[in-house]
Amino acid sequence: MASNKISFSFVLCLYMCSLLDAKSMNPTGRRCPDPNGVEKKSMCYSSCKTQGFMGGSCQGHKGNYMCECYEG
């Protein structure tokens, strides 16, 4: 009986932690220039706002940067 309560508590804790990750990123597939830490033209932000997201930024690694939108 005690192990069931512990298992339930553990699963509940994991579920709550997943809900706290509200600012998940959504890759859009739109390429963007190398941001060097700052996206100067705000291309991704405005593109994501147009699609109904809360905002976005240019993310990735050298030679492969994509716009990623914030869902919430």
Curated annotation (Swiss-Prot):
Disulfide links within the chain: C32-C58, C44-C67, C48-C69
GO terms classed as biological process: defense response to fungus; killing of cells of another organism
Protein location: Secreted
Signal sequence segment: 1-22
Keywords assigned by UniProt, alphabetized: Antimicrobial, Disulfide bond, Fungicide, Plant defense, Secreted, Signal
Annotated GO CC locations: extracellular region
Protein family per UniProt: Belongs to the DEFL family.
Designated name of the protein: Defensin-like protein 35
Taxonomic lineage from the root: Eukaryota, Viridiplantae, Streptophyta, Embryophyta, Tracheophyta
